[in-house]
Amino acid sequence: MEMLQKRKHQTIDETSLNNLIENEKKKIKSLLAFGVPKECVLSRSFTPCELLGPERDHLGMLMFRLETDAESPKFLLISVLFLAMNAFNVSFCTRTSLANLYKTSLVDSINTMLDSCSYLEEKVSLFGVTNYISQGTNCLISCVMQGHVYDVRKENIYGLVILKDLLLEPDWEPRQNAIQYIYLCYIYRQAFNKIEYGIYIVLSELTHEEVLIDLLRNKFSKERFMFMNYLINGDGNLNYFGSLQRIGHCKTQNIKSGILDLQGISLTIIRLKDVFVELCERKIFL
C-alpha cells in the first residue's frame, strides 16, 4: 500500500494530448512523403561474365558465392538459375532451356566442382539479390544483403525473380496472411546410388523455422525415407537431410506471375515486388 502511494502518475491535459497527436501526424506524413527506407547493406564482387546469362539483363536475382579452393580466384558468383540446372525439382524442359543459356567451358568446370560436393552448402553460400551488374570481361556485381532492392539511384525497386519450378508453398492455406516470409531451402535425396539436391524458394506465413521444418519433413517424407535408408546403408559422412534459411519477406499482394523471355527461350517465373531482403542464419535438419 505504501508503494502504491509513492508511485507517481503523470496527468495529461488537453494541450499535451494534442501535441502528441500532432507529432504522430508529422511522423506519418514524413513516411508517406519519403516512402520505404532506402538504406540497405550491399555486397560487391567481380566475377567472369561468362558465368552470367539472364542475370545481366534482369536484376533482382539471388546470387551465391562459390568457393573454388583455388588460389585465384578464391570464389566466384553464380545465380540461382545456374544452380537450378542440376536440381532434381526442376523439370527436364526447364533444365534444358537453362543449359542453353549457359554454354562455356567455365560452366562445365563449375558443374564438375558442384558434383564433387556431398552438400551444396559446403561450397555455396548466399551473397544477396542483384541490384547492379556492370558489363565487360569481368562483371562487377552489387547485391543487397539487407534492405529493399533499389537500383543505384535509389529510384526503383527490382524485387525478387523466382523460377516457378523452384517455388514451394507448404502452408495448409497458402497466401492467406498479409505478409509472406521467403526462405531458401535445400533438400537432398538418394537416386542411382548418389545424392542429388533440390533447391526451393519457400513462401510461408510462418516465422518459426522449427514449425516450418516439420511441414517440410512431412512434405518430403518419401525423399527423407530414401535419404535415411542411404545413410544406414551407404555414406556415413552425411548428417542432415535439408537446410532452411530465411532471406526476406514481402506483402502477399505483391506476388505476381510472369514470363522471362531470354534469347528466344521463355521461362515461367514468379516476381516478388517490394521485397525486403534480410539474410538470416541457416538451419539444418534431419
Swiss-Prot record:
GO terms for molecular function: DNA binding. It is found in: Virion; Host nucleus. The keyword DNA repair does not apply. Pfam families: Herpes_VP19C. The keyword Mitochondrion does not apply. Transmembrane segments: none annotated. GO terms for biological process: viral capsid assembly. It comes from the Viruses. Belongs to the herpesviridae TRX1 protein family. Structural component of the T=16 icosahedral capsid. The capsid is composed of pentamers and hexamers of major capsid protein/MCP, which are linked together by heterotrimers called triplexes. These triplexes are formed by a single molecule of triplex protein 1/TRX1 and two copies of triplex protein 2/TRX2. Additionally, TRX1 is required for efficient transport of TRX2 to the nucleus, which is the site of capsid assembly. Interacts with TRX2, MCP and capsid vertex component 2/CVC2. This is Triplex capsid protein 1. The lineage of its organism: Viruses, Duplodnaviria, Heunggongvirae, Peploviricota, Herviviricetes. The gene is TRX1.
